Design a protein with these regions (language model features):
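Extended hydrophobic leader/signal-anchor segments used for secretion and membrane insertion
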Residues: 1-173
C-alpha cells in the first residue's frame, strides 16, 4: 500500500565548532598595530614634551603637544606661525615663531621687532624686553624665528636666522 504521508525531513542539527583564537593571529594583529603606531608617532604625529620657557606664555615649560610633521611638505610657513624646528639630531626639536622671510629686513629696537622698517604687531609677546638687534636682511633659503618669551636674554634664545630645511612641522595645540 502506498504511503500517502508526506515525506518527513530528516532533522539534523548543525553545530558550529567553537572558534579558538589562534595565538599567532593575535600576535600578528598586535604587531601590526604596534608597527603602525610607531610609524605614525615617528613620521606624522609626534608626541612632544616642551622643555624650556622660550615660548611662554604660548607654550609652558613641561607642557605637552603633538607635532604634525608632514605640514611643510604640503604648506609654506606663514608669518607669526609657531613651528617645530629640527635641532641637534633626530629627537630634539625647538618651538619658535616665524617672523620674517628671505629678502625682508629685521631689526629689534628696545624690544620691539621691525620687519621691513615697520613694527610687527605681536600680541602673543607678554613679557617685554630691551633687546637690540641691528638691521639685517634675511638671506635666501633662511627664515627669521624667535620665541615668544622675550624677557629671557637674547643669548639664551635659539632663534634668529635659520635654514628653511630645519622646519620639521607644526604643533597641533
Amino acid at each position: 500500500m502506498p504511503n500517502n504521508e508526506p515525506p518527513q525531513e530528516e532533522s539534523s542539527t548543525f553545530v558550529r565548532p567553537k572558534k579558538q583564537k589562534d595565538w599567532r593571529v593575535v600576535a600578528i594583529r598586535i604587531g601590526v598595530i604596534a608597527a603602525v603606531t610607531v610609524l605614525v608617532c615617528l613620521f606624522i604625529l609626534r608626541p612632544m614634551v616642551i622643555s624650556g620657557g622660550s615660548m611662554m606664555p604660548t607654550y609652558s615649560d613641561k607642557g605637552f603637544t603633538f607635532g604634525f610633521l608632514p605640514y611643510f611638505k604640503i604648506y609654506a610657513p606663514q608669518r607669526k606661525q609657531v613651528v617645530i624646528l629640527k635641532h641637534a639630531g633626530f629627537n630634539t626639536f625647538l618651538l619658535k615663531r616665524v617672523l620674517a622671510f628671505p629678502g625682508e629686513t629685521v631689526e629689534i629696537r628696545n624690544g620691539v621687532l621691525y620687519v621691513n622698517g615697520k613694527e610687527l604687531d605681536e600680541p602673543y609677546v607678554k613679557y617685554p624686553c630691551d633687546w637690540n638687534l641691528s638691521r639685517r636682511e634675511v638671506p635666501k633659503g633662511k627664515i627669521f624665528v624667535l620665541g615668544d618669551n622675550r624677557s629671557m636674554p637674547i643669548q639664551n634664545h635659539m632663534g634668529g636666522m635659520i635654514d628653511k630645511s630645519r622646519l620639521a612641522g607644526v604643533p597641533i595645540w
